[in-house]
Amino acid sequence: EAFNIGTQTSDYPGLGLSEAVYQPNVWPAAEGERVPEGMKQFRANLERWFHAAAQTARTLTGVFEHALNVPEGTITALASHSVDVLRCINYVLPPGTSAKVDDEQMGMGEHTDYGIVTILWADRVAGLQVLGTEGQWHDVVPEPGALLVNLGDVMARLTNDQWLSTLHRVKPPVENGVIRRRRAAAFFHDGNEDAVVHPLPGMVDASHPPLYKPLTIGEHLLAKLGGSKGLQINNRDTEREAARVLASART
């Protein structure tokens, strides 16, 4: 089961943002209805987590600028009204049910995240795997109190693939033949819908020709979402990223 919230048009009044992209959040109880106290706390906690994760993402993009030796604000300017999404997932079987899984079954197949950076909280339960540079999958279990950070496809485009987006997957958390409960909260910091993505200063030279054509983050997200839902690559500029995912599925 999963529950999502994200950036809304009301978060940035006066910018004329598209409500199709910056959609209003839908909570279990509508405005004006009697809301159980526990549900009020659920909303307050989730909104607090959303804003804290957004601040962490902004801090990280500033760190990225320093590490890449680009002018301050170069990357953060692409996310002044970022399309951000917090997705909370509870991998659990209904009470009284059981299931058998084989070694090839996935909770979520090989993929990269679409945006700039992802901030992930997860239980200390095995399941998440990351593909290493040597081509092997590695289990990732966070240290107590730690967050996991994935680079997204926008970051790969900005660095002309000098920093690659993190290829990862989720396997069912099985222990002694029983699927264990696993929870995760992923904050996707994708950037402004209208921001144009092209290589940062210093990322292109005679030895490193441009690998991607400029496009807006909105166009990039639309191509990614359309491809994943339609099981096709509907934008030729996504072929490079798709090839990495397909190659990883064979390892």
Predicted feature locations:
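Peripheral, non-catalytic segments flanking oxidoreductase cores
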Residues: 1-251
